[in-house]
Swiss-Prot record:
InterPro entries: SecD, SecD/SecF_arch_bac, SecD_1st, SecD_SecF_C, SecD_SecF_C_bact, SecDF_P1_head. Belongs to the SecD/SecF family. SecD subfamily. The lineage of its organism: Bacteria, Pseudomonadati, Pseudomonadota, Alphaproteobacteria, Rickettsiales. Forms a complex with SecF. Part of the essential Sec protein translocation apparatus which comprises SecA, SecYEG and auxiliary proteins SecDF-YajC and YidC. It comes from Rickettsia prowazekii (strain Madrid E). SUPFAM superfamilies: Multidrug efflux transporter AcrB transmembrane domain (SSF82866). This is Protein translocase subunit SecD. The keyword Cell inner membrane applies.
Length: 518
């Protein structure tokens, strides 16, 4: 009489109990602090939600970068007393003319010192500067990656929405937010660059002249919005005294009149700069600007040393919270344009889930009937192992908080058929041994041992394909790959460990004369 391996019994019990605990939140609400309470995340196609395709405005970023480069070049040319004229940015290139071709050598040294990745084109005394292809691609990748991270933080500031963000092509970003019931809110927070800057107000400028286009050199006209006076214009200095890059905290609050405000704090460097600004400009107005729109322009009453401040304006509670969120996560490197928008209703997702349930149930019942008709009692053991495999799949999806999509359901249904493949291989090998006239115990042991290598090889090749789909696929393809991978691992465990254990228990304690396979 054979002895049952204790490690298999213990392992099977532990895995099954753990799987039940992990899968339970999908059926009932768990409030215990000691038990898992996360259920499976449903993808956009099952849960409904918003699907946005964003275009990264790289041309604007490149133009701003070239403008900064042009300013740096002007300072260096003046410093080295090199004469030039008509220095301007056009079509993402810097164009200028030098007064004498003899200064070209010195000019090239200055440009290479500023940025060695700049390509210099020379036509007599006319110079054209542009980024090299490698620098252009590096900047593009940097801007897209930064945009993806900022979008992720804006959309999922609490870490509970599970958005899907994928780069598509050179400068497109696909954003999917399952369960989003307010796509207009998403469009609002993504449509703002959230570039916060501090400027001094140009008190000497004439507003009426500025509106007509006569803006003093070094200043600019911007628009504000007052609760009491409506829209109005103000002239501010172009020079940025301080930017939102130094902010560490931002939160919505209320002032003494119960009006919504945004409170903020700077880091050490920002606090020092802010203190110097307020100390040196007491009595002047400090304009707080967001995306070239005036938020407020309070009078500086004295030095502010602590690095804390407030932004007042025509805020509602919602807009104050929204601005605080945008300031906390930081500004986008460049504007984003929404070029495609789709909303998937929850009813469509519910229909997909119901169809998936029906297909899965039909497939499961058909497989179970086939196994019992073909293999009798041990076919029933394969069905029990199949049920446990489905339990393990459900538990692992819940444990890893994987997102289940419609293709993922297809992967699970496919796993139902694949799960019994291993059992079929084993049972057919057992049949071959029984035809040789050997004992039941020997046939079972030999059948499992001889089929083991084949089962491992076939499943490993499928896993390789699943990994490739996950690495190179996007969206729904990844969901299919995840479900397929988890399904393969679960079915291998149930077929090799669970089925063998059930058959061993049956043979040891019930001592059947025949296995019903002949």
């Amino acid at each position: 009489m054979q002895n049952l391996p204790k490690w298999k019994i213990v392992l099977s019990i532990i895995c099954t109990v753990f799987a039940i605990i992990c899968a339970l939140p999908n059926f009932i609400q768990i409030n215990s602090k000691f038990l898992p309470h996360d259920s499976i995340n449903l993808g956009l196609d099952l849960r409904g939600g918003a699907n946005l395709l964003l275009d990264v405005d790289f041309d604007t970023y490149l133009n701003d970068s070239m403008e900064n480069l042009a300013d740096t070049l002007r300072k260096n040319l003046r410093k080295h007393k090199i004469g030039y004229k008509n220095l301007l940015v056009r079509h993402n290139n810097i164009q200028l003319e030098v007064r004498s071709p003899e200064v070209l050598k010195s000019l090239k040294k200055i440009i290479n010192k500023i940025d060695p990745e700049i390509i210099i084109g020379v036509n007599k005394n006319k110079i054209k500067l542009r980024y090299s292809e490698s620098r252009f691609n590096d900047l593009l990748n940097k801007v897209v990656e930064q945009s993806i991270e900022i979008v992720r933080m804006r959309v999922d500031s609490t870490g509970t929405k599970e958005p899907t963000l994928q780069r598509q092509g050179n400068k497109h970003i696909l954003l999917q937010v399952p369960g989003s019931e307010n796509p207009s809110y998403l469009k609002n927070i993504l449509g703002k660059t959230a570039k916060l800057t501090f400027h001094l107000v140009d008190e000497n400028a004439n507003i009426e002249d500025a509106i007509k286009g006569h803006v003093p050199l070094g200043s600019m006209l911007i628009k504000g919005d007052s609760k009491h006076h409506g829209e109005y214009y103000i002239v501010i200095k172009k020079k940025v005294l301080l930017s939102g890059a130094h902010l560490t905290k931002a939160s919505a609050s209320f002032d003494q009149n119960s009006q919504p405000i945004v409170a903020f704090s700077f880091n050490n460097l920002g606090s020092k700069i802010f203190g110097e600004i307020t100390k040196n400009n007491t009595g002047k107005r400090l304009a707080i600007v967001l995306d070239n729109k005036l938020l407020s322009a309070p009078i500086i009453n004295g030095a502010i040393i602590g690095g804390n401040g407030i932004i007042t304006g025509n805020f509602t509670i919602e807009s104050a919270n929204e601005l605080a969120l945008l300031l906390r996560v930081g500004s986008l490197p460049t504007p984003l344009k929404i070029i495609e928008e789709r909303s998937i209703g929850p009813n469509l997702g519910a229909d997909s889930i119901e169809s998936g349930k029906k297909a899965g149930l039909i497939g499961f019942v058909a497989v179970c009937i086939f196994m019992i008709l073909s293999y009798g009692v041990i076919g029933l053991f394969a069905n029990i192992a199949l049920i446990l495999a489905l339990l393990y799949i459900l538990a692992l999806l819940s444990l890893f908080q994987a997102t289940l999509t419609l293709p993922g359901i297809a992967g699970i249904i496919l796993t139902i058929g694949m799960a019994v493949d291993a059992n079929v291989l084993i049972y057919e090998r057992i049949k071959e041994e029984l035809h040789k006239g050997v004992s039941n115990l020997y046939a079972i042991r030999t059948g499992f041992e001889s089929a083991f290598a084949t089962i491992i090889d076939s499943n490993i090749t499928t896993l390789i394909v699943a990994f490739a789909l996950y690495i190179f696929g996007v969206g729904a393809i990844k969901g299919f790959a995840v479900a397929l991978t988890i399904g393969i691992i679960s079915s291998m465990f149930s077929a090799i460990i669970i089925t063998k254990l059930l058959i061993d228990v049956w043979v040891k304690y019930f001592k059947p004369k025949k296995l019903g396979l002949l």
